[in-house]
Amino acid sequence: MNIVDNEATTVEEGENNYTFGSAEYGYFDVNNNVIYKSGTTITVTENMEFTSINTLSIEATKGVGIRFADSSGLRFKATITTDNKTALNSDAITEGFLITTNDIYTENRFNGKVLTVENKPEDGKKWFNDEEGKYCGSVVNIVDYTRKFVAKAYVTINYVNADAETLESDVVGYKSISGVANYIIDNGFIGNYDEKAQALINKFAGK
């Protein structure tokens, strides 16, 4: 027996194949944590349960922040929205950022030197501040504080029976760590940070 979106489908004896419907981003196998592409046929060998993935989108936040923890740098943030949170929280869907400098992007888009930052769980937590679907990616150890960086976020559906499909956000950033630091100072936000962070902000701003 198959259960798709809480509706049971009986597969008759000797007819052990099942063809998925037309959900936009496939069907998540709840028991095995994998995703099947829509319209494909599987062999049913046991009771199986699937949930459809009808919506999936990704948006990168236009503003850029400063990363203070561990190695400091510029931090980008993105949000994934979907109607299937169980699939989103599985390893079958992966996400991250592509980051490069503004000058490289202007000349080669993301075909030149690109830093790929995968979103990896830390301490068992996949999402930034425990906000489901939100994650960050950073470029650290920046030498030239005035050099501008750009980024785009991506989310990939890793189908078990087909090529992976990747969605990408618009390009955001066009900011330097010096520019972000000076914005914090000029707008009176520096008082919101502790002494260690304030010292870094002043350093990046060239104060």
Where are these regions (language model features)?
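Short, surface-exposed linear motifs at loops/turns and structural transition points
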Residues: T55-K207
